Every structure is written in structure tokens, then in C-alpha cells.
Amino acid sequence: MQKITRVHLHSEQSQLDKLCSSILEIDPKVRYATVFARHGEFLYEHIRKGLSPLLDKEQTYRSFQQAIMRWSSRQLLQKQLGPAKYAMAEYEKVKRYTFYLDVHLILGVTTDVDANGKILDKILERISVYTK
């Protein structure tokens, strides 16, 4: 089992933290937001107050490692299709979104399964502010 640590990038620290917290403020159906570094570290994690995680830390870590591999695969198609904006998987209990922030960072967001598409639009708006 790999050790899960949290680090902070000094120049982006408050910006990334604010991004996660602002995503949780979008709607009560947003359960979780995290920024995960491609080298394997959780930089920030925010979970809605009163909720318990559905995955333990190791399962969450492995899930994001797999997401990084999938984003690498998507980049191979970028020339033909253009850059991917996000990826989404709908499970019985939640929807899980991943967003490519830059070459080093992935944003993960989990919502309740009945969350509507307006939440996604608002997340994309918040990301566009971060990536400017």
C-alpha cells in the first residue's frame, strides 16, 4: 500500500483550495472535490460536511491513479478530436467526474447520482477561472 500524503504548491495553494471549496458550494448534491497530482499525491480534498466517504483512502488513491492513465490515453487522441474537457462515470450511488487542469493536476468531483447537468456547467465555469 502506497503512503498517501498531501503537499501544497506554494504559488497555487490558495487557488486550488478555493477551487475545491467553491465547487462544493455549487450545490448540495456535490459530495466531494479533490485535486490530485499526476505524481500520485492528493493536494486538496474537500468532502461535504456530514457525509462519509464511500471509498477508503487506498481505493480513492487507486481510482485516481487509473484516472491519470485514462487521461494520458485521451491525450493521444487530442490531435484528431481536440482536448477532452472532462470524463464522467455514473455508478449506482454517485457520478464521478475528472477534469484535466494541467500537465500535473487532475480535479476529481463526485456528485449524487440525481445531480443535474447545470452542476457540470458551473464546475466548468469555475475551472475556466482557475486555468486562465
Which ranges hold each PLM region?
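Non-catalytic interaction/Regulatory regions outside core domains
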Residues: M1-K132
